């Protein structure tokens, strides 16, 4: 199982717009991905409701996990997305 940590860069955390963009990216990867905050349960990263319930604000460190073909590359790309301010236009 591949695992990566990322720091949420979006200025408002994983609220509606960044969460939507992240969920779309997860679903495009074709591998199951989970996300968790320190000490929390692994949640489905492909679910907007799970992401919104995570309560990840700017600067929160999250752990992503994935399994299967392409998991390493998928996580690298997802970490890069989370570490980009998705609120900046």
Where are these regions (language model features)?
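Long, contiguous binding/interaction regions
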Residues: 3, 24, 89
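Compact, glycine-rich, soluble single-domain proteins
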Residues: 9-58
């Amino acid at each position: 199982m591949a695992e990566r940590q990322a720091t949420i860069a979006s200025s408002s955390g994983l609220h509606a717009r960044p969460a939507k963009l992240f969920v779309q990216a997860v679903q495009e990867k074709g591998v199951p991905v989970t996300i968790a905050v320190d000490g929390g349960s692994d949640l489905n990263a492909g679910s907007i409701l799970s992401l919104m319930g995570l309560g990840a604000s700017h600067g929160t460190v999250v752990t992503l996990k994935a399994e299967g073909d392409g998991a390493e590359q998928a996580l690298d790309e997802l970490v890069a997305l989370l570490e980009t301010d998705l609120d900046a236009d």
